[in-house]
Amino acid sequence: MLTRKQIELLEFIHKRLQRDGVPPSFDEMKDALDLRSKSGIHRLITALEERGFIRRLAHKARAIEIVKLPEALMGSMQGGFAPQVIDGDRLDPPVGAMPVSGIHAVELPVMGKIAAGTPIEAISEVSHTVAVPGQMMRQDAEHYALEVKGDSMINAGINNGDIVVIRETSVAESGDIVVALVDGHEATLKTLRKRGNAIALEAANPAYETRVYPAEMVRVQGKLVGLIRSY
């Protein structure tokens, strides 16, 4: 059974598809449901997807397929229902925008901040979304983004405030820059080095020491595949 907010969001998306042929933005969804942050929209969309009402298409910006509607909505919809895919790439570009051939953007959730310094408490709450070139990502994997906090990776070209694009994986090789979860609750962005039965998390700044942990204390959460910087 869907919650009232889930039904409201599904109805809003469906009506926008029928009217405009393009999906509402996350900001529009947030305003329509009178929510204070877009993280609430992400949770609702995830719940609808898990229950089989919508499907998000990988590597297409804001592409949503409505699979079915609940009975509570079917009676109020005229003309029947047919699943359809709404491709966010069809939105009109801003005035003055220049077309870039062969590039399309994927909207990724920014799952909070990651420490490039001393490990901080792991954050898994969506703070906002960011448009990422689809070429950064593999089609057979999930991805997310994090905002960098700290300067321990500056010699690897990663600065405080950068957005890093992470491919979800639990496997990494020595020398990979990874998101590592230490002791189950502290997350950090570091270069991973395997040392026998231990794992070293190495900074790219001489001001920070390399930290070494028993292998069972470190869990790889993902591997760095790209970086976005605002000037």
UniProtKB/Swiss-Prot annotation:
<comment type="similarity">
    <text>Belongs to the peptidase S24 family.</text>
</comment>
<keyword id="KW-0234">DNA repair</keyword>
<keyword id="KW-0227">DNA damage</keyword>
<keyword id="KW-0235">DNA replication</keyword>
<keyword id="KW-0804">Transcription</keyword>
<dbReference type="GO" id="GO:0006508">
    <property type="term" value="P:proteolysis"/>
</dbReference>
<keyword id="KW-0238">DNA-binding</keyword>
<dbReference type="Pfam" id="PF01726">
    <property type="entry name" value="LexA_DNA_bind"/>
</dbReference>
<keyword id="KW-0068">Autocatalytic cleavage</keyword>
<dbReference type="GO" id="GO:0045892">
    <property type="term" value="P:negative regulation of DNA-templated transcription"/>
</dbReference>
<keyword id="KW-0805">Transcription regulation</keyword>
<keyword id="KW-0378">Hydrolase</keyword>
<feature type="DNA-binding region" description="H-T-H motif">
    <location>
        <begin position="26"/>
        <end position="46"/>
    </location>
</feature>
<dbReference type="GO" id="GO:0006260">
    <property type="term" value="P:DNA replication"/>
</dbReference>
<dbReference type="GO" id="GO:0006281">
    <property type="term" value="P:DNA repair"/>
</dbReference>
<dbReference type="InterPro" id="IPR050077">
    <property type="entry name" value="LexA_repressor"/>
</dbReference>
<dbReference type="InterPro" id="IPR006199">
    <property type="entry name" value="LexA_DNA-bd_dom"/>
</dbReference>
<dbReference type="GO" id="GO:0004252">
    <property type="term" value="F:serine-type endopeptidase activity"/>
</dbReference>
<feature type="site" description="Cleavage; by autolysis">
    <location>
        <begin position="116"/>
        <end position="117"/>
    </location>
</feature>
<dbReference type="InterPro" id="IPR036286">
    <property type="entry name" value="LexA/Signal_pep-like_sf"/>
</dbReference>
<dbReference type="InterPro" id="IPR036388">
    <property type="entry name" value="WH-like_DNA-bd_sf"/>
</dbReference>
<feature type="active site" description="For autocatalytic cleavage activity">
    <location>
        <position position="190"/>
    </location>
</feature>
<keyword id="KW-0742">SOS response</keyword>
<comment type="function">
    <text>Represses a number of genes involved in the response to DNA damage (SOS response), including recA and lexA. In the presence of single-stranded DNA, RecA interacts with LexA causing an autocatalytic cleavage which disrupts the DNA-binding part of LexA, leading to derepression of the SOS regulon and eventually DNA repair.</text>
</comment>
<dbReference type="InterPro" id="IPR006200">
    <property type="entry name" value="LexA"/>
</dbReference>
<dbReference type="GO" id="GO:0003677">
    <property type="term" value="F:DNA binding"/>
</dbReference>
<comment type="subunit">
    <text>Homodimer.</text>
</comment>
<protein>
    <recommendedName>
        <fullName>LexA repressor</fullName>
        <ecNumber>3.4.21.88</ecNumber>
    </recommendedName>
</protein>
<dbReference type="InterPro" id="IPR006197">
    <property type="entry name" value="Peptidase_S24_LexA"/>
</dbReference>
<dbReference type="InterPro" id="IPR039418">
    <property type="entry name" value="LexA-like"/>
</dbReference>
<feature type="active site" description="For autocatalytic cleavage activity">
    <location>
        <position position="152"/>
    </location>
</feature>
<keyword id="KW-0678">Repressor</keyword>
<dbReference type="GO" id="GO:0009432">
    <property type="term" value="P:SOS response"/>
</dbReference>
<dbReference type="InterPro" id="IPR015927">
    <property type="entry name" value="Peptidase_S24_S26A/B/C"/>
</dbReference>
<dbReference type="Pfam" id="PF00717">
    <property type="entry name" value="Peptidase_S24"/>
</dbReference>
<dbReference type="InterPro" id="IPR036390">
    <property type="entry name" value="WH_DNA-bd_sf"/>
</dbReference>
